[in-house]
Curated annotation (Swiss-Prot):
EC number: 4.2.3.3
Classification via Pfam families: MGS (PF02142)
Keyword Magnesium: no
Lineage of origin: Bacteria, Bacillati, Mycoplasmatota, Mollicutes, Acholeplasmatales
Catalytic center residues: D60
Protein's gene: mgsA
Coiled-coil region: none
GO terms, molecular function: methylglyoxal synthase activity
Name of the protein in its database record: Methylglyoxal synthase
Top-rank taxon, per record: Bacteria
Key words, A-Z: Lyase
Substrates-to-products reaction catalysed: dihydroxyacetone phosphate = methylglyoxal + phosphate
SMART domains in UniProt: MGS
Length: 122
């Protein structure tokens, strides 16, 4: 499975904990992430992550392109809904593409945990 990992700044620590908690499962899949998120994940885990640009520098658009081209199967995007993002149009476009192309999307830790638990059960 091809999985994207994205987290806004205030959610990066939560994403790192999520990847630590599910490292065994995630290590069996191809992972992609925006630059800063992916770098931090690799610093704190043994996971191999294919890096895109940082979100505000076009990374969200790169992930969106992967969705539109059928190159992603699942997106974990830990969003910070309480902080305005300078690249909010890119974020909205990425979320829209998940809906258009029917790619499962978890935008918080609880949903992401449920996805992993379900996938492990298969």
């Amino acid at each position: 499975m091809r999985i994207a990992l994205i987290a806004h700044d205030k959610k990066k620590d939560l994403m790192i904990q999520f990847t630590k908690d599910h490292e065994d499962y995630l290590s069996n899949h191809t992972l992609y992430a925006t630059g800063t998120t992916g770098t931090r994940i690799m610093e704190h885990t043994k996971l191999k992550v294919n890096l895109k640009k940082s979100g505000p520098l076009g990374g969200d658009q790169e992930i969106g392109s992967m969705i539109a081209n059928g190159k992603l199967d699942l997106v974990f995007f830990f969003r910070d809904p309480l902080t305005a993002q300078p690249h909010e149009p890119d974020v909205s476009a990425l979320l829209r593409l998940c809906d258009v192309y029917d790619v499962p999307l978890a935008t918080n830790n609880a949903a992401a945990d449920l996805f992993i638990k379900h996938l492990k059960g298969k």
